[in-house]
Amino acid sequence: MTDTLASLAYLAGKPTAQAKIKAKPEHFQVREDLGFEFTGSGEHLMVRIRKTGENTSFVANELAKACGVKSKDVSWAGLKDRHAVTEQWLSVHLPKAETPDFSAFLAQYPSIEILATARHNKKLRPGDLVGNDFVVTLSEVSDVDDVLKRLETVAKLGVPNYFGNQRFGNNGNNLQEAKRWGRDNVRSRNQNQRSLYLSAARSWIFNLIVSARLEQSLFDKVLLGDILFKGDEQLLVSAENHADLQSQYDAGDLVISGALAGDNALPTQDDALALEQVFLDAEPDLMALIRGNRMRHDRRAIALKPANLSWQVDGNNIILTFSLDAGSFATSIIRELVQEIAFEREF
């Protein structure tokens, strides 16, 4: 598979150590955190599943059959990796109060477990989660000491908050199609397809902006005209507050943001605007798609700092534990630590 991110900069240089990722399903464990409680009643049956070596859409389709409903009646907050052991909630539109008998379903699919059920008054929609907890094993690590040094840097500074390869499709196909749609002014009623390509377009431009800040040693430097996050508040950097905001950033109180391009003007100014505008101008096909669909500009943190990061060494394996907010990619953490060893999976 092509690494769409291969040309993007690293925080501490490209890793020299190599390791296998997802050598076994249990080497990549994910637990979803919705961040809210269920109402206890309502038309939607919430089903907590643990799946091993299966993708979310397949499990959802099979669960729909087990419940006697259509596939469109089962939804989720986020798609989870196939080559992994993952826990997440699925919602089933099932107005009747009875919970189906899942025994035949579970007997048919030993790779799927049902951990809990509950009732709720709303269906799950994509994005209805606050984050995910991860336990990731890097196996057959070629240079454990180098990875441990890099982990210390990650704990202190975080990593570039890149959108991962998953966002761009197999071999970057979603990104290439996004460029074609923009170039040829393609119009489609397929909302899912359009959403995939728009997401790939904005994500790629954002990645280029973050990479440029790294290459220009501006990843941790506040620029004139930057938009900074302070909790839910956004602050514009001016000549008057520049020094003060840099100090607050250095103290860990502020976060530098990058552009998620839209059809409206960038809100950044001065040096930050000049830096970001270059990459919007460099991708006319992607911008044509974004503007043609009237996407509105948004902002995203350029640095990803994993919460609750810890690690332990087991021979030449390193086991990582961390939590990420929704929309962040565990692969962005791994990318800063090791180069992935290609191998044939047996699952």
Swiss-Prot record:
Domain TRUD: 158-304
Keywords, ordered alphabetically: Isomerase, tRNA processing
UniProt xrefs under InterPro entries: PsdUridine_synth_cat_dom_sf (IPR020103), PsdUridine_synth_TruD (IPR001656), PsdUridine_synth_TruD_CS (IPR020119), PsdUridine_synth_TruD_insert (IPR011760), TruD_catalytic (IPR042214), TruD_insert_sf (IPR043165), TruD_pseudoU_synthase (IPR050170)
Catalyzed reaction equations: uridine(13) in tRNA = pseudouridine(13) in tRNA
The protein's Enzyme Commission number: 5.4.99.27
Molecular-function annotations in GO: RNA binding; tRNA pseudouridine(13) synthase activity
Active site (UniProt): 81 (nucleophile)
Lineage: superkingdom: Bacteria
An example Gene Ontology biological process: tRNA pseudouridine synthesis
GO cellular component, as recorded: cytosol
EC supergroup of this enzyme: isomerase
CDD domains: PseudoU_synth_EcTruD
Stated role: Responsible for synthesis of pseudouridine from uracil-13 in transfer RNAs.
Family, as annotated: Belongs to the pseudouridine synthase TruD family.
UniProt protein name: tRNA pseudouridine synthase D
Naturally occurring in which organism (per UniProt): Vibrio vulnificus (strain YJ016)
